[in-house]
């Protein structure tokens, strides 16, 4: 069973401390995560196959590196570049999936009507527009999808799509530099939010909130944000999950959101044990 890491500070207390900085005008939002650990090392390939079955997502990856193995099923694009068109697809706003189709629709409607979630989402859309604006041809930044619902195995998300024409004198590396790390994994303003994250999260994030993908010789790029990702190292599995903290965030609600986001990997682990 995944358990909150004993090294982590109590999540609800960190939410309260983060809100103090918001009230002081220090930040608008910070994405605070916590680590969940599984004191065993499942077969990474079986975990990957279980993830594909339980939580099929736009980005599925199995990466065996020197000391660690990453197994991920990420729903979120970090940044994409295809034939000169740059795209961000921020996710902000989460609800658990309903047990019935009717309950699922009710939860989706509730998410779309939640003023707190909408305000948080629009702020991150603006952050994404600003990031792209630094590398875009003048006047080409546009929001093509705004606050639509995407459903996954255990949660549903509110998602938008932002795109632009990349300036002709720039390339994929310039685009990555302008947009990384994703605002949906840091908060706003980015730098100050990251400073507070470094203070409140007692352990390094590791791969969480980074990016996995490719940059091709043709100049195209497609990177996923490393969320819903298990990191297996030294006979221990770790997965991080976070929530965006704003002025009216409820500490208990945000804590439950992190658990809901970690559930897909928990279910994959259970499937391995049953097989």
Give the label of every model feature segment.
Residues 1-275:
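Extended alpha-helical targeting/anchoring segments
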């Amino acid at each position: 069973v995944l358990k909150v890491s004993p090294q982590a500070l109590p999540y609800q207390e960190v939410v309260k401390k983060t809100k103090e900085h918001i009230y002081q005008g220090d930040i608008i939002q910070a994405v605070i995560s916590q680590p969940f650990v599984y004191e065993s090392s499942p077969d990474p390939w079986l975990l990957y196959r279980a993830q594909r079955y339980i939580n099929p997502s736009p980005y599925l990856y199995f990466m065996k590196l020197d000391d660690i193995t990453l197994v991920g099923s990420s729903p979120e694009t970090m940044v994409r570049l295809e034939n000169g068109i740059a795209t961000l697809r921020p996710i902000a706003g989460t609800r658990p999936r309903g047990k019935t189709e009717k309950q699922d629709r009710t939860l989706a409607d509730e998410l779309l009507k939640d003023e707190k979630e909408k305000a948080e989402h629009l702020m991150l859309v603006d952050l994404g527009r600003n990031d792209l604006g630094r590398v875009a041809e003048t006047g080409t930044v546009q929001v093509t999808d705004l606050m639509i619902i995407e459903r996954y195995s255990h949660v549903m998300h509110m998602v938008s799509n932002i795109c632009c024409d990349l300036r002709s004198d720039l390339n994929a590396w310039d685009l990555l530099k302008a947009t990384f790390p994703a605002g949906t994994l840091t908060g706003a303003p980015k730098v100050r939010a990251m400073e507070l994250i470094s203070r409140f999260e007692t352990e390094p994030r590791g791969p969480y909130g980074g990016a996995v993908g490719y940059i091709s010789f043709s100049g195209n790029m497609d990177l996923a944000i490393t969320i819903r990702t298990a990191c297996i190292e030294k006979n221990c599995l770790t997965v991080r999950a976070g929530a965006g903290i704003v002025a009216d965030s409820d500490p208990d609600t945000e804590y439950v959101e992190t658990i809901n986001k970690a559930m897909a990997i928990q279910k994959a682990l259970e499937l391995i044990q049953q097989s």
